[in-house]
Amino acid sequence: MALLKKINTQVNRIMKNSSLVQNICFDRVPLFIPRLSLTVKYCLAVKLLIYLLYCWYIYSEVPSASSKFRSFTFGCVVVYHNKFFPRFIRTHSINSIRTFSKFQVIILFSIEKVTRSESKNHSYSKTDISDLHQGYNNPPSRFISQ
């Protein structure tokens, strides 16, 4: 975990020096920016990987969560690729995540929600699963890309 924190710190430093970050507040970046530099894209990819490794670290403590985590991880990767590399996945329905910041919040909220649920009763409830996916299964129509 210490290594992940060091990598995350370096990535944050690179992103702070980027002209994109200087000119645009990151929580207001639109879904698709053609001029988004490759450096920023790769930094965001590394940050996503860090969060997924963190998810894996937490879920590995809970045996019953492994299959749910695999599908959740795949969903995260699809959302990420659809947001920053839309030429790969143009028609996927998961277009609703408008910003990387919101995406991070969804991941962290999901980790907390499932971990709390597992520690209480060691099983999933339908409510917890629907909470995990409500961010991109029921998108506000104004957030869906054209």
Swiss-Prot record:
Location relative to the cell: Cytoplasm; Nucleus membrane
Principal cellular location given in the protein's record: cytoplasm
Pfam families with a match to the protein in the record: Pombe_5TM
Swiss-Prot/TrEMBL keywords: Cytoplasm, Membrane, Nucleus, Transmembrane, Transmembrane helix
GO CC, alphabetical: cytoplasm; nuclear membrane
Keyword set includes Membrane: yes
Transmembrane region(s): 38-60
InterPro entries, per database record: 5TM-prot_SCHPO
Membrane topology: Single-pass membrane protein
Signal peptide: none
Family: Belongs to the UPF0742 family.
Protein name: UPF0742 protein C1348.03
Species in which this protein is naturally found: Schizosaccharomyces pombe (strain 972 / ATCC 24843)
